[in-house]
Regions:
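Beta1-alpha1 glycine-rich phosphate/pyrophosphate-binding loop at the start
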Residues: 1-82
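FAD-binding core/adjacent interface of flavoenzyme oxidoreductases
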Residues: 1-3, 74-139
Length: 139
């Protein structure tokens, strides 16, 4: 029996909560395979990044390993390089010495997050303080 493959791209709130929902519904079915792909192996609770930056919380207080959160959804730590919509294939690389990994899908969820828009204002990207990652909070 051919399984229906669902791939979720992105390990932020959108991707992880989609995976959690599917973990309790579709992923229970024998004919469905759900996979979450993220470059990070943890969910970062970004609303508390300012607490890490101020020293009130440790970084470990606001991260949760994705693998521990999911029972039936497979997790793949990889970087998405491109998506072939015609072939229904996601091209990724994984590992320190990037190894190609191609994942076929029947249904694709895009939850890749966002990038800060500085609206073309000169010098802002280099001097602005952003809080989107643990690295930002450590600075």
């Amino acid at each position: 029996m051919k399984k229906t493959k669902v791939i979720i791209l992105g390990g932020g709130f959108g991707g992880v909560y989609t995976a959690l929902r599917l973990d309790t519904t579709l992923a229970r079915r024998a004919d469905v395979e759900v996979t979450l792909v993220s470059s990070d192996n943890f969910l970062l609770f970004t609303p508390l990044l300012h607490e890490v930056a101020s020293g009130d919380l440790n970084p470990s207080d606001i991260v949760n390993p994705i693998r521990r959160m999911l029972k039936r959804v497979q997790f793949v730590q990889a970087d998405v390089r491109s998506i072939d919509l015609t072939a229904k294939r996601v091209h990724c690389t994984r590992g320190l010495r990037p190894v190609p990994l191609d994942l076929d899908y029947d249904h694709l969820v895009l939850a890749l997050g966002s990038e800060t828009n500085f609206f073309g204002m000169q010098g802002v990207a280099e001097t602005a303080v952003t809080l989107k990652t643990l690295g930002d909070a450590a600075e």
